[in-house]
């Protein structure tokens, strides 16, 4: 897999992965806390 646009592609992937990671941790935290307190 060659990088045709090395300037914009990795930044976009980094932002997307960071956003998805935070969102996943946030949702998992809410589900876990609600499961425990329920």
Swiss-Prot record:
Record membrane topology: Single-pass membrane protein
UniProt KW keywords: Membrane, Photosynthesis, Photosystem II, Reaction center, Thylakoid, Transmembrane, Transmembrane helix
Membrane-spanning segments: 17-37
Gene Ontology CC entries for this record: photosystem II reaction center; plasma membrane-derived thylakoid membrane
InterPro entries: PSII_PsbL, PSII_PsbL_sf
Pfam family, one: PsbL
Compartment(s) where it occurs, according to its Swiss-Prot or TrEMBL record: Cellular thylakoid membrane
UniProt-listed GO biological process terms: photosynthesis
Coarse class of the protein's main subcellular location: membrane
Entry keyword Thylakoid: yes
HAMAP family for the chain: PSII_PsbL
Subunit structure: PSII is composed of 1 copy each of membrane proteins PsbA, PsbB, PsbC, PsbD, PsbE, PsbF, PsbH, PsbI, PsbJ, PsbK, PsbL, PsbM, PsbT, PsbX, PsbY, PsbZ, Psb30/Ycf12, peripheral proteins PsbO, CyanoQ (PsbQ), PsbU, PsbV and a large number of cofactors. It forms dimeric complexes.
Family assignment from sequence similarity: Belongs to the PsbL family.
Function: One of the components of the core complex of photosystem II (PSII). PSII is a light-driven water:plastoquinone oxidoreductase that uses light energy to abstract electrons from H(2)O, generating O(2) and a proton gradient subsequently used for ATP formation. It consists of a core antenna complex that captures photons, and an electron transfer chain that converts photonic excitation into a charge separation. This subunit is found at the monomer-monomer interface and is required for correct PSII assembly and/or dimerization.
Listed name of the protein: Photosystem II reaction center protein L
Species of provenance: Prochlorothrix hollandica
